[in-house]
């Protein structure tokens, strides 16, 4: 048994959630077409790095979570590990495993 891993060297733009989702999805599609089982994305790929005070804007963290859900919905067999901003009582630099349309 083998495990084929891809590393997506995309260049996310800080604050451009829509553009970053497009970059992530394009790289994901290439990795899956190449037969990869898992593809890793950069730290905070959804928001761009560093998001700094953008995370304090009303709605930005929620929009980042919606963008992550869009990426997850595109996934099939190949898993994607995607960096995003997680929120609980505090904000966290996190990574989500997305596969089969789910986070």
Regions found by a protein language model. Name each.
Residues 1-103:
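Hydrophobic structural segments
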